[in-house]
Amino acid sequence: MSSPAYDVIAALKQEGLKPSDWQEICRRLGREPNRAELGMFGVMWSEHCCYRNSRPLLRGFPTEGPRILVGPGENAGVVDLGEGHRLAFKIESHNHPSAVEPFQGAATGVGGILRDIFTMGARPIALLNALRFGPLEDPVNVGLIEGVVAGIAHYGNCVGVPTVGGEVAFDPSYGGNPLVNAMALGLMETEEIVKSGAQGVGNPVVYVGSTTGRDGMGGASFASAELSADSLDDRPAVQVGDPFLEKGLIEACLEAFSGGDVVAAQDMGAAGLTCSCSEMAAKGGLGVELDLDRVPAREEGMTAYEFLLSESQERMLFVVKAGREEALMQRFRRWGLQAAVVGQVLQEPLVRVLHHGEVAAEVPATALADDTPIEQHELLQEPPADLQELWQWQESQLPALDDPASVLLTLLDDPTIASKRWVHRQYDQQVLANTVVSSGAADAAVVRLRPQQGQGSMESVQRGVAATVDCPNRWVALDPERGAQAAVAEAARNLSCVGAEPLAITDNLNFPSPETPKGYWQLAMACRGIAEACRALNTPVTGGNVSLYNETRRDDGTLQPIHPTPVVGMVGLVENIERVVGLGWRQPGDAVLLLGVAPDEQGDDRLGLAGSSYQMLVSGVLAGRPPRVDFELERGVQQLLRQAIDAGLLASAHDSSDGGLAVALAESSIASSLGVELKLNGRPEGLTRTLFAEGGARVAISVKAECRPQWDQLAAESTVPITELGVVNDGSTFRIHCGEKDVQWSLADLKRAHQEGLPRRIGGEAES
C-alpha cells in the first residue's frame, strides 16, 4: 500500500488533528498514514466521535437500574416499561450544521436521531427538541429560528413521526451559535434488541439506503471546531436529507430485523462509512473489509477519502447471516432502496478498505473506535475567580419593585417565557394518533402505548410514556453543578406533573471549548451535578451526546462562548393516561395550592432571584449563585404529585420555573381562560421574591372541589410544605393579594402579552 506525499501540516489542520496526534497515529500504524487513513483518524478522533475531552467525566454517570436494558455505548438506550413494552430513546445535537445551513442542519439532525432509534429495532413514536438562539432583535437570529423550525417540521412531518414537545430559549450567548438538540423515542418491535457489534467471520456486510455523494464531507470534524465568519464556507459539510426515503428505510429495516437475518446494524451518521465500519468491528472484537467499488455512488470519480468521509444521509450498514444476503437485499429494493454487499467480517481486528482493486486503507479497528486519545486536563480546585466574584451579588442590589403588574406582562412577553405556538403549530403533533398531551398543554408530552407488532397487550392502551427536555442555562452559567442538578430535577418534576414515574435520562452536553481552565471546570462540574441528581432521583443515564467548542469568533478575534447548556431528556411511565392533567385550571371552585417552598420564605437558599428571568429583565446582569436543589424535597413533591394524580384528585399541575410563581400561575389562567383570586403571604419588602423568585421544587396545583377531603387526607400524610393560595373562578381577572399589595390583570392582557411575544419579534402571526 503506497503512501502518497502530501502536506502533513495542512492536512492535520484540515482534519482538526494535532502534531501529537500525528505522532501517535504513526506509532500505532508503524508507518505514516496515507491521506485517506489520516482522514479516518481525523473524524474518529474528533470530540464529536470519540469524546476525547469528556469521556473520563462521563464515566461518573450512574448507568444501571432495574428498568435499564441497554445503557451507554449503543445507538440508543432502552428501558423496560413492563407488559411487553420496551422504549428506546436518545438525544443528539446538530448545532454547527444548523448555524451555517439552518434548514438542512436541523432536518438532518432529526433524520439522524430517528436512525439511532430504529437501528435498535424500535419504531419511532415521538420527537422532541431543545433549541437555543440569540436575541430576535438581530435579523440573523430570526433567520436561524425560521430555518431551524422549518427544517425540523419538514423532516418530522414528512417521515410521519409526531413532534410532541420541547423547549426554546433565547440569550445573547447563543448569537451566531444556535443549539439544535433532537430527541426521539421508539417502541421495540423485535424480540431481540438489535446491537451494532459485528459477529460471524465471513458474514457479508450489506449497505442499504441512499447513494453516497460528496455532501457532508468532514461533518464530524466540523462539529468539533469553533464557529467564525468563515464557517459559511463549510456548507458542504452540512448533509442534505430525504425524509421520504427515510420513511421507507424505517419500514424496510423493521421488516428485516423481524426476520432474524440481520446480525448487527449501524446507521451511517457522523463520519459515515468510516465510523460505521470501525464501530461495528471494534464492538464485535473482529474486523471489517470494505470494497468501495461496490458502494452505490451518486457521483463519478469519488476518491477513497471522499467515500470514507461522506456523510450522505439515510444510509445503513448491516452484518447479515451468510447465505441470506440476497433475500434481504431484495426486501430492501422493494422499498426503493439501494442495497449491495460491500464487504465481509474479518478475523483480524482491523478495518481494511479496498478501492480500484488495491488496499486504500488498513487500520486497527480499536485505534479508530475504542482505544482513542483522551485529553488530560487539570481540574481547577476551586471555582473560577470571576464566578466567585459574581456569587457575591445580593438580591438587595435589585431595584425596588414599583409596578408588579407591568413586570409580569413584560416577563410573559419575553420570548423564552412567551407561548411557543408559533413553533409548535408548524409540527404535526398528532400523526400516528397516539399523542395524548403535546407541547404547551402540559409540563411534559404524553404518548399512548399501543401494542407494536405483537409487543405489549391490549390492556396497555391505558398506559403511556411521558417525555420532556429541560435546562436552566443561566443557572448553569453561574453554577454548573447546581444548574445541572436543577436540569435533572426539573425534568423529573415536569414528568411528575402529568403523573408519570421518571425512569431514565439521555443528556446532551452543549459546552464551549474545554481547553480553557474555566471551560473544563464547567463541563466537569455539570457532569458531577447530573450524576448527583440522577442518583438522588433514581434516573440512570442511558447515553447521549457531547457537543463542545460551541463558541463564535468575533470580528475582533475574541471568542463568544455559549452558556454551558447540559440539556436533560427524560422519559417516564404513565400507568393511566385518563388521569393525566395539564397546566391549565379546569373549573371554577377548585382550590389552588402550592407544593414546595412557601412564597413567604424570604431567607431560604432553595429559592432565589440569582439567574432568574426577573434579574435579567430589571438589571440586565447575570450574577449571584442560583438556588440550592433540595433532593429530599424534590422526591417528596414529586411523589405527592403522582399519588394525587393517580387518585384522580387534581385538575391541573404546573411547575414554577422561568419567571417564578407569578408567571406559573398566570400561565395556568392563560391556558384555561379562567380567572383566579390568590393570596400570597409576605412582607411588602419581599414582594419581588414572593412573585418572581425561582427554584424551590415548587408546583402550582388545582384540587377538584369534590375531591378536597381525599386531598386533605393525602396531604396530611406527607411532609411536603403545602400553601393554600386561592380559588379558581369564572371571571376575567387574574388577581393577587400580597401583603398590603392588591394587584390584578385582565386575562385578555395576560394572553396578549404571552401569545404575541414570539411572533411579533419574528414577524409571524400571533395566536387567535
UniProtKB/Swiss-Prot annotation:
The active site is at H48, H94 (proton acceptor). PANTHER family: PHOSPHORIBOSYLFORMYLGLYCINAMIDINE SYNTHASE SUBUNIT PURL. It comes from Parasynechococcus marenigrum (strain WH8102). Monomer. Part of the FGAM synthase complex composed of 1 PurL, 1 PurQ and 2 PurS subunits. InterPro entries: PRibForGlyAmidine_synth_PurL, PurL_linker, PurM-like_C_dom, PurM-like_C_sf, PurM-like_N, PurM-like_N_sf. One of its GO terms (molecular function) is ATP binding. Belongs to the FGAMS family. This is Phosphoribosylformylglycinamidine synthase subunit PurL. Disulfide bonds: none annotated. The gene is purL. It is found in: Cytoplasm. Mg(2+) 1 binds at E92, N545. It catalyses: N(2)-formyl-N(1)-(5-phospho-beta-D-ribosyl)glycinamide + L-glutamine + ATP + H2O = 2-formamido-N(1)-(5-O-phospho-beta-D-ribosyl)acetamidine + L-glutamate + ADP + phosphate + H(+). GO terms for biological process: 'de novo' IMP biosynthetic process. ATP binds at Y51, K90, D507, G544. NCBIfam families: FGAM_synth_II (TIGR01736), PRK01213.1 (NF002290). Pathway: Purine metabolism; IMP biosynthesis via de novo pathway; 5-amino-1-(5-phospho-D-ribosyl)imidazole from N(2)-formyl-N(1)-(5-phospho-D-ribosyl)glycinamide: step 1/2.
